[in-house]
């Protein structure tokens, strides 16, 4: 049934600024952008990482009714090779700490999370299993 995520969407009140911020963070420009009915940018999408996962930035005016305006809920953790360095970079770019750097057991898992300047929770994680799967797929 569930085979992997297709797109993660982050809502933003300032899509132009969010697109610039994520382009700087990721070191790439969005590969796809779409205007809304009024001609203003409504959606920008990046492909990132080893599996080219999609991160979509969406103008909040298109959010479903009842979408939370405050950070919280599910945290998607993106694998990083150095949680401390990634965490410091995010904070230096204006993100705010949501979850401090936290070792998870004794198997090498480490997580942290921030709230981006647009109100979205962004998790980062060093995950040995991610690297094992990457290695076994021949992508390492």
Q: What residue spans do the PLM features occupy?
A:
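Vicinal oxygen chelate
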Residues: 1-7, 26-79, 87-115, 126-140
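Catalytic core of Fe(II)/2-oxoglutarate
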Residues: 11
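Conserved active-site tyrosine of GNAT-family acetyltransferases
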Residues: 18-23, 90, 119
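Active-site-proximal beta-strands of protease catalytic cores
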Residues: 123
């Amino acid at each position: 049934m569930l085979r992997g995520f297709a797109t993660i969407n982050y809502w933003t009140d300032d899509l132009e600024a969010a697109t610039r911020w994520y382009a700087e963070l990721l070191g790439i420009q969005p590969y796809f952008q779409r205007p809304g009915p009024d001609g203003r940018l409504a959606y920008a999408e990046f492909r990132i990482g080893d599996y080219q996962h999609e991160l979509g930035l969406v103008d909040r005016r298109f959010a479903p009714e009842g979408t939370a305006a405050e950070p919280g809920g599910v945290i998607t953790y993106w694998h990083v090779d150095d949680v401390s360095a990634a965490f410091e970079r995010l904070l230096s770019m204006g993100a705010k700490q949501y979850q401090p750097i936290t070792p998870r057991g004794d198997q090498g898992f480490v997580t942290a999370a921030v709230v981006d300047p647009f109100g979205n929770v962004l998790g980062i994680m060093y995950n040995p299993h991610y690297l094992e799967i990457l290695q076994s797929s021949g992508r390492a």
